[in-house]
Design a protein with these regions (language model features):
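C-terminal motif of bacterial Sec signal peptides marking the signal peptidase cleavage site
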Residues: 16-20
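Sec-exported extracytoplasmic/periplasmic mature domains
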Residues: 47-54, 95-116, 125-139, 153-170, ...
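Peptidyl-prolyl cis-trans isomerase
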Residues: 220-283
Length: 376
């Protein structure tokens, strides 16, 4: 009988203990404005904040050791050399993330925004892809599929907000004149062909002298094109492609590549100034592209693996303004919108439950994946 009573008491204690564990994880941590912040969204915001801190870690700091890393000090602004403890930084960035999420939801609704069924399906599909790829990391941090779906819809709403605020029929529309000026002066419409700096069969890399020869040959072809370039963008693109195709056999000969020049793939891209720095990583290559006048061509080594022959074309001769509007608005106004959302989110009434948030501490973050992401 005593054994049965003891067993019953143990079972009861286990049941109470399990119930306590379930109840210790809140469904919500409160609201910002009228937007409810679920515990999952809080954990996602906190996990993203931790990843930002990890990106700022020095080579001697190990962000995979969460408890010790939270006590470390990181430099949060390289220009001012401002520092903060990781725990403080994560707390601040978590709140900023939540304020931005709430601001997006609130502004989107206030401006009459509504995602289409197709847009919602797109966001949900991407969320499922993220869970398939990073699900173990998300689950280890208490982040489920529904939370990731909500997050992806918030991101999509922020994109739609650009048009709701700055579009033709937006709250503060950007004029066609301003948009045209930005497209012509701040964006780079390139037609280009990439040339590998290695033999495409043996993968033997070109040495420095071979690279120099290839650039000399390519630049010679571009220098011959430039003085005789036509007046219109379409004609410039055609003449550039002819000049580039003509020199490809000589470039391929340097690395003994047997590819057919006729199979070379010419592409076009509309790039922002920041895109140039991201895409053209070899020294001086981004500045060489920036220096191009409309219709002018050049050759650059843009990475360790390839060189490029490129011509800058007038975007509005290649595409209609409406076709470029969303890309231009995104580049022109995204930073301004993000700043406005951050300020607006901070101004909304905060009704966050510190007790609930204390049950979701940063020290419980699991950071064992170098490839973890929140879709940003």
């Amino acid at each position: 009988m005593k054994k049965r009573i003891l067993a019953l008491l143990c079972a009861l204690a286990l049941t109470v203990g399990l119930a306590g564990c379930v109840l210790s994880t809140p469904d919500t941590v409160g609201t910002i404005g009228d937007v409810e912040i679920s515990s999952g969204l809080y954990l996602l915001a906190q996990f993203d904040a931790y990843q930002k801190a990890a990106d700022l870690a020095s080579s001697e700091q190990d962000a995979s050791k969460v408890k010790s890393f939270l006590k470390e000090t990181i430099t949060v602004d390289a220009d001012t050399e401002e520092t903060a403890t990781v725990s403080d930084y994560v707390a601040q960035q978590t709140l900023k993330n939540l304020e931005t999420y709430a601001a997006i939801e609130t502004r989107f609704d206030a401006l009459g925004g509504q995602l289409t069924a197709e847009q919602e399906a797109q966001a949900d599909s991407y969320a499922e892809q993220l869970m398939n790829q990073y699900g173990d990391t998300y689950k280890a941090n208490g982040i489920g599929l529904e939370t990731v779906k909500r997050f992806e819809r918030i991101l999509l709403k922020s994109t739609v907000l650009l048009d709701l605020v700055y579009g033709e029929n937006g709250e503060t529309p950007v004029s066609d004149a301003d948009l045209t000026d930005y497209i012509e002066n701040d964006l780079y419409y390139l037609s280009y062909v990439a040339v590998p700096l290695y033999n495409t069969t043996s993968y033997a890399f070109a040495d420095d002298s071979q690279k120099a020869l290839m650039l000399e040959l390519a630049q010679g072809a571009m220098s011959s094109y430039n003085p005789t370039r036509p007046a219109t963008a379409a004609a410039q693109q055609s003449a550039f492609q002819s000049a580039a195709t003509a020199v490809l056999p000589d470039l391929y000969d340097v690395t003994a590549t047997t590819d057919d020049p006729a199979d070379a793939s010419f592409s076009t891209s509309l790039l922002s100034d920041s895109d140039l720095d991201t895409s053209f990583t070899a020294d001086g290559s981004a500045d060489a592209i920036r220096a191009l006048q409309m219709g002018e061509a050049t050759a650059v080594q843009y990475s360790t693996l390839a060189m490029m022959m490129a011509v800058r074309l007038d975007p509005l001769q290649m595409s209609a303004l409406d076709a470029l509007r969303s890309t231009a608005l995104s580049d022109m106004k995204s930073a301004e919108l993000q700043d406005a959302l951050a300020e607006y989110g901070a101004s909304l009434p905060h009704s966050l439950d510190t007790s609930a948030m204390s049950k979701l501490p940063a020290k419980k973050i699991v950071n064992n994946s170098a490839n973890s992401t929140t879709g940003n």
